[in-house]
Curated annotation (Swiss-Prot):
Pfam families: Iron_traffic
Cross-referenced SUPFAM superfamilies: YggX-like
Top-rank lineage group of the source organism: Bacteria
Keyword Translocase carried by entry: no
Keywords: Iron
UniProt protein name: Probable Fe(2+)-trafficking protein
GO cellular-component term (any): cytosol
């Protein structure tokens, strides 16, 4: 049976993650309050931000920026986009 969570981003019950994505309290919070759908979308967006903004994960400032944007994204707030990115229309 699939575990469900009240997703912080989508404000509805959705399937949850299989395990915490990070160790510690941050990972536990994401595991308990973020759906698999929201986490998968964040991972795609994170990759786009790293590539388009040429973020260096060895740089503490770049990691802090990405962490802040993850918190915004998963909370349903306004978050940084890659410059010039236009989401595909249906």
């Amino acid at each position: 049976m699939t575990r469900t969570v009240l997703c912080r981003k989508y404000k509805q019950e959705l399937p949850g993650l299989d395990r915490a994505p990070y160790p510690g309290p941050k990972g536990e919070d994401i595991f308990a309050n973020v759906s698999k759908q929201a986490w998968d979308e964040w991972q795609k967006h994170q990759t786009m931000l790293i590539n388009e903004r040429r973020l260096n994960m060895m740089n503490a400032e770049d990691r802090k920026f990405l962490q802040t944007e993850m918190d915004k994204f998963l909370s349903g707030e306004e978050y940084a986009q890659a410059e010039g990115y236009v989401p595909p229309s249906e």
